[in-house]
């Protein structure tokens, strides 16, 4: 299997095994494939050409999967959009990608997503479908006249090296960049991922990680399709709901960020639920204390707990721990390279450093993205002439090849599993009339792992308070990007070339 259409067709072989559960709705694998086919036919009927982009701005749901896979079945390129984005942020992704279709879930988080987008330019957009409303039914009926032979022809035209998705990830330039991914690399990486974690057809996987993220999409429902595991997507993370679903649906696989497991361990009603079905946890994105791993095994019944490391540009995966690794290795490292991927740690001159010495983590192999969509300059800045992807992360590799992440060159911090980029937040805050200069850094937070903190220089003669500025920011950016604290300063610390010394700002917060 080298294309997503081939994966979907192979999944039909799981037949009447339960494939998907959402509330009181249930689908077998055969029924799931039928729903995907209906969407694929509708895309053909409505004029989706090969390589056209299809954006989905909605929470985890069966319709998200059906639309995404349906588009990919006929050569469309999926463009997931973060549900926490504001209208301007989403419109930028739609416009930049040239998406012709947009799927939304109006009413989610009390937001009318269609209206949010309509106030911003997105000239490429032709169809907007609300997966919660009548337009969804109209969409799936649109393809009823498309023959099986036409569908088969479009499926067969999808090549392994075609793009399957463009996932926009924010960057240090302050504007999201579209990371391109091919069918073949996506399938190969997550076939490997699934084998390492031991996901199988007897598993029932509660997908709490959002589908707009590689963790929920590729390490989520795509991995389940590859292995025949049942999928139970969750639109919003809520500990009581997770506990109830684990108990009633006999969930065995529960990957997620460390905050997920801490929230469960610390919930006062945890002991009222039968969690004995749990067996598989995969985590990363933040430090994992060895004590937490011990408690997950002893108190939550997990047999397999693995940590991993990767970025969107590496198809989500570079290194992974293995099932026979000891708790200290799982806690203190992000594992070793997956098969047939090269990983090195290099200095500022791109020379490999000795084991145990800190440097930038670089990788090379089939997992490396083809590049950023319509951005050759950014691509050349990230992938060197020898094909090495420069992650921007600082780490140390031990004698076994296991990697420990120690810092981030790009100043990114991770808020509850979501990547937050200071430059993007700073650019937004500079839009406030009272803000002259701003620098954002991450600080430790017991619940979220890290949160943002802004150091702000006010404009002369202008006045704004912390609460006012934070509330202003909430209306203009995703909640995880909003600084949790603000310190007003007379000036920012700068080096000789005028660059903000962010390490000094971090020291002030210690």
Descriptions of predicted regions:
Residues 85-91, 102-104, 254, 365, ...:
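AMP-binding/adenylate-forming catalytic core of the ANL superfamily
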Residues 16-69, 86-91, 137-144, 157, ...:
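Conserved AMP-binding/adenylate-forming core of the ANL superfamily
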């Amino acid at each position: 299997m080298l294309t997503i259409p081939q994966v979907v067709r192979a999944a039909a072989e799981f037949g009447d095994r339960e494939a998907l559960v959402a509330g009181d709705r249930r689908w077998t694998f055969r029924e799931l494939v039928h729903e995907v086919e209906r969407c694929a036919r509708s895309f053909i009927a409505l004029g989706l050409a090969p390589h056209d982009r299809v954006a989905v701005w909605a929470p985890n749901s069966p319709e998200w999967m059906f639309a995404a896979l349906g588009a990919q079945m006929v050569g469309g390129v999926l463009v997931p959009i973060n549900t926490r984005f504001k209208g301007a942020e989403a419109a930028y992704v739609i416009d930049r990608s040239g998406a012709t279709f947009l799927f939304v879930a109006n009413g989610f988080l009390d937001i009318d997503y269609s209206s949010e987008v309509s106030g911003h330019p997105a000239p490429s957009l032709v169809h907007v479908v609300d997966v919660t409303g009548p337009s969804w039914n109209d969409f799936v009926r649109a393809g009823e006249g498309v023959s099986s032979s036409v569908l088969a022809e479009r499926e067969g035209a999808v090549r392994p090296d075609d793009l399957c998705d463009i996932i926009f990830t924010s960057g240090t330039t302050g504007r999201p960049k579209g990371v391109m991914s091919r069918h073949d690399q996506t399938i190969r990486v997550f076939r490997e991922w699934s084998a390492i974690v031991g996901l199988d057809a007897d598993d029932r996987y509660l997908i709490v990680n959002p589908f707009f993220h590689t963790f929920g999409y590729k390490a989520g429902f795509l991995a389940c399709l590859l292995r025949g595991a049942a999928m139970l997507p969750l639109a919003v993370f809520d500990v009581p709901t997770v506990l109830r679903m684990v108990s009633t649906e006999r969930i065995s696989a529960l990957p997620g960020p460390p905050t997920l497991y801490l929230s469960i361990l610390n919930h006062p009603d945890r002991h009222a639920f039968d969690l004995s079905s749990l067996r598989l946890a995969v985590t990363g994105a933040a430090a994992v204390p060895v004590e937490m791993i011990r408690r997950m095994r002893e108190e939550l019944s997990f047999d397999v707990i693995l940590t991993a490391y990767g970025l969107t540009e590496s198809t989500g995966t570079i290194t992974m721990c293995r099932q026979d690794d000891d708790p200290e290795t799982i806690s203190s490292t992000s594992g070793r390279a997956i098969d047939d991927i090269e990983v090195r740690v290099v200095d500022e001159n791109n020379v490999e450093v000795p084991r145990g010495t800190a440097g930038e983590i670089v990788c090379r192999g089939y997992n490396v993205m083809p590049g950023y969509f319509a951005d050759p300059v950014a691509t050349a800045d990230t992938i060197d002439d020898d094909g090495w992807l420069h992650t921007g992360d600082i780490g140390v590799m031990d004698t076994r090849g296991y990697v420990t992440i120690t810092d981030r060159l790009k100043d990114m911090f991770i808020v509850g599993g979501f990547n937050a980029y200071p430059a993007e937040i700073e650019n937004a805050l500079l839009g406030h009339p009272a803000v002259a200069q701003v620098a954002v850094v991450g600080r430790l937070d017991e619940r979220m792992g890290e949160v943002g903190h802004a150091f702000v220089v006010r404009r002369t003669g202008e006045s704004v308070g912390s609460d006012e500025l934070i509330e202003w920011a909430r209306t203009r950016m995703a909640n995880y990007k909003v600084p949790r604290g603000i310190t007003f300063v007379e000036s920012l610390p700068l080096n000789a070339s005028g660059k903000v010394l962010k390490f000094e700002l971090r020291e002030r917060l210690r």
